[in-house]
Amino acid sequence: MQPGGQPDMSQLLAQAQQMQQQLMAAQQEMAEAEVTGQAGGGLVTATVKGTGEVVGLKIDPKVVDPDDVETLQDLVIGAIEDASSKAQEIAAQKLGPLAGGFGGGGLPGLPGF
């Protein structure tokens, strides 16, 4: 703090730049991370990047029944939802601490930020 209770702008700028670098690193880690979700006890598995992009889908031939396509569709959706949920957990773990710098406490010395 400078005299008069004003924040030191160079210190705030350095802190903001550090947070930006941490955010970029966390986003890169998320983009490279892959998680796998499953349904039907592993009969259908889906692989999703941390960004939410589906990059893989494996279906055990045992669940392919031409007379019961709906079950297979449900299993595929379930596996993708499971993987997406795991990707969101990774995002919360990686970005949560960084977002905490803006929410609630905000930037030190700057109310509302």
UniProtKB/Swiss-Prot annotation:
The keyword Amino-acid biosynthesis does not apply. Pfam families: YbaB_DNA_bd (PF02575). InterPro entries: YbaB-like_sf, YbaB/EbfC. It is found in: Cytoplasm, Nucleoid. GO terms for cellular component: bacterial nucleoid; cytosol. Gene3D superfamilies: Nucleoid-associated protein YbaB-like domain. One of its GO terms (molecular function) is DNA binding. Keywords: Cytoplasm, DNA-binding. Belongs to the YbaB/EbfC family. Homodimer. Binds to DNA and alters its conformation. May be involved in regulation of gene expression, nucleoid organization and DNA protection. This is Nucleoid-associated protein ROP_41370. It comes from Rhodococcus opacus (strain B4).
